[in-house]
Amino acid sequence: MRKQAGGPCEKLNFPLVELEPYARVNRETTKLNKAHVRRDYSGRSICQPDTNNPTRWKYERPLETIRAWQDVAEGKVPASNEKAARVSNLKTVPSLKRENKEVNANSKPPVKQQEVIESTVISKSQSPSVKQLKLTESTLLAPSSSLKPSVSLKKDISSNLLCAAASNGYFRRPAAMRAQTLVPITQPDSKKNELKQKFKHLVHHVLT
């Protein structure tokens, strides 16, 4: 017998394979979005380390940063001139002025100082009196113009200076804040606020 059109069997006549919907239906664009490549002032791409990976952030720092930290340990300081700092931020090699000229990696005390130290050292065979010991101590500790220490007393390196060294004179906010701007360290907050106020007044004056 021939089935009538529109019967109950016709409703169960589903397709066996359902085609995948088009990309345009599934997502907004057919094109894949490329990650924006960061480029420097001359157009070369800047390789940024993976900030989400804590081990890379801890152990794999860029060479420039490592060198800058070494410079700070040696006693070099980033240029205090704001314009010079900006310019050095663009260059590959940071322009740093040496604060501590006497500091060297393999520096030995001068010959005169060594001689004085050797002459003041007392052997065990001699049993000096308290007065003699005091005299020797005073000669050792007395500051003399002829004896200059090879390494002058190191100052405590401030966190600001380390930040400056790590980013060539600029303090970079942490990556978690998603702040791409570089804030110069030298400018205090009060000065910034004054500048903001001046700018507001200027804008208000122009608009009115």
UniProtKB/Swiss-Prot annotation:
PANTHER family: MEIOTICALLY UP-REGULATED GENE 9 PROTEIN. The lineage of its organism: Eukaryota, Fungi, Dikarya, Ascomycota, Taphrinomycotina. Residues 77-114 are annotated as: Disordered. It holds the Pfam family DUF2406. Has a role in meiosis. This is Meiotically up-regulated gene 9 protein. The gene is mug9. One of its GO terms (biological process) is meiotic cell cycle. Keywords: Meiosis. It comes from Schizosaccharomyces pombe (strain 972 / ATCC 24843). It comes from the Eukaryota.
